[in-house]
Amino acid sequence: MARVKRALNAQKKRRTVLKASKGYRGQRSRLYRKAKEQQLHSLTYAYRDRKARKGDFRKLWITRINAAARLNGITYNRLIQGLKAAGVEVDRKNLAEIAVSDAAAFAALAEVAKAALPADVNAPSGEAA
Protein backbone atom coordinates (compact mmCIF):
# COMPACT_ATOMS: atom_id res chain seq x y z
CA MET A 1 0.00 0.00 0.00
CA ALA A 2 1.03 3.55 -0.61
CA ARG A 3 2.04 5.67 2.33
CA VAL A 4 -0.32 8.51 3.23
CA LYS A 5 1.67 11.44 4.56
CA ARG A 6 -1.11 13.99 5.03
CA ALA A 7 -3.85 11.89 6.60
CA LEU A 8 -4.34 14.11 9.65
CA ASN A 9 -4.31 17.31 7.61
CA ALA A 10 -6.86 15.93 5.15
CA GLN A 11 -9.11 14.74 7.96
CA LYS A 12 -8.92 18.12 9.65
CA LYS A 13 -9.69 19.91 6.38
CA ARG A 14 -12.71 17.69 5.73
CA ARG A 15 -13.91 18.06 9.31
CA THR A 16 -13.79 21.88 9.14
CA VAL A 17 -15.67 21.96 5.82
CA LEU A 18 -18.36 19.59 7.12
CA LYS A 19 -18.62 21.58 10.34
CA ALA A 20 -19.10 24.80 8.38
CA SER A 21 -21.76 23.16 6.19
CA LYS A 22 -23.90 22.13 9.15
CA GLY A 23 -27.46 23.22 8.45
CA TYR A 24 -27.35 22.76 4.68
CA ARG A 25 -29.97 20.40 3.22
CA GLY A 26 -29.34 16.80 2.22
CA GLN A 27 -25.99 15.71 0.82
CA ARG A 28 -24.62 19.22 1.10
CA SER A 29 -24.21 18.76 4.83
CA ARG A 30 -22.97 15.16 4.75
CA LEU A 31 -20.74 14.60 1.71
CA TYR A 32 -17.41 16.40 1.57
CA ARG A 33 -17.38 17.28 -2.13
CA LYS A 34 -20.96 18.59 -2.13
CA ALA A 35 -20.33 20.48 1.11
CA LYS A 36 -17.19 22.08 -0.31
CA GLU A 37 -19.01 23.23 -3.46
CA GLN A 38 -21.90 24.62 -1.43
CA GLN A 39 -19.53 26.42 0.91
CA LEU A 40 -17.85 28.14 -2.06
CA HIS A 41 -21.25 29.26 -3.36
CA SER A 42 -22.35 30.38 0.10
CA LEU A 43 -19.28 32.55 0.56
CA THR A 44 -19.82 34.07 -2.89
CA TYR A 45 -23.46 34.86 -2.06
CA ALA A 46 -22.46 36.35 1.28
CA TYR A 47 -19.88 38.63 -0.37
CA ARG A 48 -22.34 39.72 -3.08
CA ASP A 49 -25.15 40.39 -0.61
CA ARG A 50 -22.94 42.40 1.75
CA LYS A 51 -22.42 44.77 -1.18
CA ALA A 52 -26.11 44.71 -2.18
CA ARG A 53 -27.27 45.44 1.38
CA LYS A 54 -25.97 49.00 1.12
CA GLY A 55 -28.12 49.72 -1.93
CA ASP A 56 -31.12 48.00 -0.33
CA PHE A 57 -30.92 50.26 2.71
CA ARG A 58 -30.59 53.35 0.51
CA LYS A 59 -33.77 52.30 -1.37
CA LEU A 60 -35.58 51.82 1.95
CA TRP A 61 -34.49 55.25 3.21
CA ILE A 62 -35.61 56.93 -0.01
CA THR A 63 -39.00 55.19 0.15
CA ARG A 64 -39.53 56.32 3.75
CA ILE A 65 -38.45 59.89 3.00
CA ASN A 66 -40.72 60.05 -0.06
CA ALA A 67 -43.74 58.81 1.93
CA ALA A 68 -43.16 61.36 4.69
CA ALA A 69 -42.48 64.14 2.17
CA ARG A 70 -45.74 63.49 0.34
CA LEU A 71 -47.60 63.74 3.66
CA ASN A 72 -46.10 67.24 3.88
CA GLY A 73 -47.11 68.23 0.35
CA ILE A 74 -43.77 67.89 -1.43
CA THR A 75 -42.16 65.13 -3.46
CA TYR A 76 -38.87 63.42 -2.64
CA ASN A 77 -36.82 65.00 -5.41
CA ARG A 78 -38.11 68.49 -4.63
CA LEU A 79 -37.41 67.94 -0.94
CA ILE A 80 -33.80 66.94 -1.64
CA GLN A 81 -33.38 69.83 -4.11
CA GLY A 82 -34.82 72.29 -1.59
CA LEU A 83 -32.65 71.03 1.27
CA LYS A 84 -29.53 71.37 -0.90
CA ALA A 85 -30.58 74.88 -1.95
CA ALA A 86 -31.15 75.81 1.71
CA GLY A 87 -27.73 74.46 2.66
CA VAL A 88 -29.13 71.77 4.96
CA GLU A 89 -26.75 68.82 4.96
CA VAL A 90 -28.66 65.81 6.27
CA ASP A 91 -27.90 62.41 4.80
CA ARG A 92 -30.68 60.07 3.71
CA LYS A 93 -30.19 57.68 6.63
CA ASN A 94 -30.75 60.40 9.23
CA LEU A 95 -33.51 62.02 7.19
CA ALA A 96 -35.37 58.69 7.07
CA GLU A 97 -34.88 58.26 10.83
CA ILE A 98 -36.29 61.75 11.45
CA ALA A 99 -39.22 60.98 9.13
CA VAL A 100 -40.09 57.84 11.09
CA SER A 101 -39.45 59.01 14.64
CA ASP A 102 -40.11 62.77 14.68
CA ALA A 103 -42.83 63.93 12.28
CA ALA A 104 -42.78 67.54 13.53
CA ALA A 105 -39.05 67.94 12.87
CA PHE A 106 -39.47 66.42 9.41
CA ALA A 107 -42.35 68.81 8.69
CA ALA A 108 -40.06 71.70 9.66
CA LEU A 109 -37.38 70.42 7.28
CA ALA A 110 -40.00 70.11 4.53
CA GLU A 111 -41.01 73.73 5.09
CA VAL A 112 -37.37 74.84 4.90
CA ALA A 113 -37.03 72.92 1.62
CA LYS A 114 -40.22 74.45 0.21
CA ALA A 115 -39.05 77.96 1.12
CA ALA A 116 -35.67 77.43 -0.56
CA LEU A 117 -37.19 76.29 -3.87
CA PRO A 118 -38.04 78.81 -6.61
CA ALA A 119 -41.70 79.89 -6.55
CA ASP A 120 -42.78 78.17 -9.78
CA VAL A 121 -41.40 74.80 -8.62
CA ASN A 122 -43.89 74.63 -5.74
CA ALA A 123 -46.89 75.04 -8.06
CA PRO A 124 -48.74 71.80 -8.88
CA SER A 125 -47.99 70.46 -12.34
CA GLY A 126 -50.04 72.12 -15.07
CA GLU A 127 -50.32 75.52 -13.36
CA ALA A 128 -46.69 76.62 -13.75
CA ALA A 129 -45.78 79.23 -16.40
Curated annotation (Swiss-Prot):
InterPro entries per UniProt: Ribosomal_bL20 (IPR005813), RIBOSOMAL_L20_CS (IPR049946), Ribosomal_protein_bL20_C (IPR035566)
CDD domains (UniProt xref): Ribosomal_L20
UniProt keyword RNA-binding, yes or no: yes
Gene3D superfamilies xrefs: 6.10.160.10, Ribosomal protein L20
Keyword Ribonucleoprotein: yes
One GO cellular component term: ribosome
Keywords, sorted A to Z: Ribonucleoprotein, Ribosomal protein, RNA-binding, rRNA-binding
One Pfam family named in its UniProt record: Ribosomal_L20
Domain of life: Bacteria
Any one of the GO BP annotations: ribosomal large subunit assembly
GO molecular function: rRNA binding; structural constituent of ribosome
Role played: Binds directly to 23S ribosomal RNA and is necessary for the in vitro assembly process of the 50S ribosomal subunit. It is not involved in the protein synthesizing functions of that subunit.
HAMAP family: Ribosomal_bL20
Record family assignment: Belongs to the bacterial ribosomal protein bL20 family.
Cited NCBIfam families: rplT_bact
Protein name: Large ribosomal subunit protein bL20
Source organism (scientific name): Mycolicibacterium gilvum (strain PYR-GCK)
Gene: rplT
